[in-house]
Amino acid sequence: MAVSKEEILETISNMTVMEVVELIEEMEEKFGVTAAAAVAAAPAAAGGEAEAAEEQTEFDVVLSSFGSNKVAVIKAVRGITGLGLKEAKEVVEGAPSPIKEGASKEEAEEIKAKLEEAGASVEVK
């Protein structure tokens, strides 16, 4: 007389928590396995998939090139970053250069628009 999976599950669902714990311990001893390893591995796999599905929240704005109007781009970089003239000029001339790291999507888009308006090529990563 074979017992079906449904009957086993029905029996387990009628047990108390302590009885289920004892059953698991006995199964671990009988079959030489541990339930903790399987339980610990499952959430890690699910968590990795969930992180990949989440939308990116932090963006880096990178100045690719300053284009034909370097002076306007330097002014825009100074306004965005608060750098001095010399530092802003070094950032612009050293393109590709990060302008802002860890910015929100809205902030990154605003910075990109300001720099492109000044004539620069900009990437948001």
Curated annotation (Swiss-Prot):
Entry GO terms, CC: cytosolic large ribosomal subunit
Pfam annotation, one family: Ribosomal_L12_N
Cross-referenced InterPro entries: Ribosomal_bL12, Ribosomal_bL12_C, Ribosomal_bL12_C/ClpS-like, Ribosomal_bL12_oligo, Ribosomal_bL12_oligo_N_sf
Gene3D superfamilies the UniProt entry points to: 3.30.1390.10, Single helix bin (1.20.5.710)
Coiled-coil residue windows: none
Keyword set includes Nuclease: no
Keywords: Ribonucleoprotein, Ribosomal protein
Domain of life: Bacteria
CDD domains registered for this protein in UniProt: Ribosomal_L7_L12
Molecular-function annotations in GO: mRNA binding; structural constituent of ribosome
Family: Belongs to the bacterial ribosomal protein bL12 family.
Record note on quaternary structure: Homodimer. Part of the ribosomal stalk of the 50S ribosomal subunit. Forms a multimeric L10(L12)X complex, where L10 forms an elongated spine to which 2 to 4 L12 dimers bind in a sequential fashion. Binds GTP-bound translation factors.
PANTHER family the record matches: 39S RIBOSOMAL PROTEIN L12 (PTHR45987), LARGE RIBOSOMAL SUBUNIT PROTEIN BL12M (PTHR45987:SF4)
NCBIfam families membership: L12 (TIGR00855)
UniProt-recorded name of the protein: Large ribosomal subunit protein bL12
Organism: Alkalilimnicola ehrlichii (strain ATCC BAA-1101 / DSM 17681 / MLHE-1)
Gene label: rplL
